[in-house]
């Protein structure tokens, strides 16, 4: 459930509010297609920072950079999306200015869906 997802792992799972329709999740600044789900309606989508990447042919996110943390082997790029903090683990050489809009890709196969009300995994 989202309670466990929010504190297990470092960084914790990213949780984004939105809706799903026809296998496509849509939220503010986020669109992820190809989800294996027949659900329709409000959901919470979860993904791990290490499963996402900066750039890509069909980016899922276009949002301004909120912060960056250099870790030595990687750079953690944080976005503020619809009031939530979302993180992507980028290459160690990636650099962007705070406030600069950056595209990121979140693969559908690595996403988890949760009930928007109860927080239980779907």
Residue ranges and their predicted role:
Residues 1-9, 13:
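Conserved beta-strand-loop-alpha-helix hinge in the C-terminal portion
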């Amino acid at each position: 459930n989202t309670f466990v997802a929010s504190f297990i792992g470092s960084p914790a799972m990213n949780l984004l509010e939105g809706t799903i329709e026809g296998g496509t999740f849509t939220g503010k600044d986020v669109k992820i297609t190809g989800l294996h789900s027949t659900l329709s309606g409000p959901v919470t989508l979860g993904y791990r920072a290490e499963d996402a990447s900066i750039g890509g042919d069909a980016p899922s996110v276009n949002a301004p950079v909120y912060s960056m943390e250099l870790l030595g082997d990687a750079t953690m790029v944080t976005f503020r999306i619809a009031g939530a903090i979302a993180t992507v683990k980028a290459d160690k050489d990636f650099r962007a200015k705070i406030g600069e809009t950056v595209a990121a890709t979140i693969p559908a196969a690595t996403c988890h869906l949760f009930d928007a009300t109860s927080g239980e995994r779907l």
